[in-house]
């Protein structure tokens, strides 16, 4: 990926809790080894037919373990009943969008630039959605938890590394969009200077 630092996924998961992801320079850079990429592709094939169920489990667990995440999902903010969440069409749809993103990431896992662009774009969108970076790692942790019984420790570690890569790259995208928005608002706040010729 052209990253100067290769990091393995931390044993404690998720790795951080910085609400805004720090500065773009503070974001951990992770590279995916060839072995990790192969393990991810293989294990994705094993669960591909079960993505809808995994997406629901992931979000129900996310809201149970991190109820503050509901603040970003306004339609679920007042829903406390796990069964209501499990049967929610909106939650199922969002779970499928997340799983679709994971599928696209796996499909691009050997195409570094395309994978980076996909994830950076998602991070930029999350700035617009006002979804702070501290939540990104929670989603990966709940995905892994939902799959824990089906995976080997090697598969789990590979996915931890992938989600660390995804969350750190999303944070970079979030920070880039935050900086772009600030620069645009700075330009709009500057007084316009008109130059007129005096005769």
Predicted regions and their residues:
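Globin-like tetrapyrrole-binding proteins
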Residues: 2-199
């Amino acid at each position: 990926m052209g990253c100067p630092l290769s990091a393995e996924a931390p044993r404690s998961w998720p790795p951080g809790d910085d609400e805004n992801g720090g500065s773009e320079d503070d974001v951990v850079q992770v590279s995916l080894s060839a072995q990790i990429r192969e393990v991810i592709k293989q294990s994705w094939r094993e669960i591909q037919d079960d993505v809808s169920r995994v997406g629901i489990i992931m979000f129900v667990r996310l809201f149970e373990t991190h109820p503050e995440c509901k603040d970003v999902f306004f339609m679920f903010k007042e829903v406390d009943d796990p069964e209501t969440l499990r049967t929610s069409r909106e939650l199922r749809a969002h779970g499928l969008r997340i799983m679709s993103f994971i599928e696209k990431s796996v499909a691009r896992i050997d195409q570094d630039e395309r994978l980076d662009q996909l994830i950076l774009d998602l991070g930029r969108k999350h700035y617009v959605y006002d979804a702070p970076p501290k939540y990104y790692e929670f989603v990966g942790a709940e995905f892994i938890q939902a799959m824990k019984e089906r995976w080997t420790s090697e598969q789990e570690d590979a996915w931890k590394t992938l989600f660390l890569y995804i969350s750190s790259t999303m944070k970079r995208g979030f920070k880039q969009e935050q900086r772009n928005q600030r620069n645009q608002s700075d330009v709009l706040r500057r007084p316009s200077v008109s130059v007129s010729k005096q005769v």
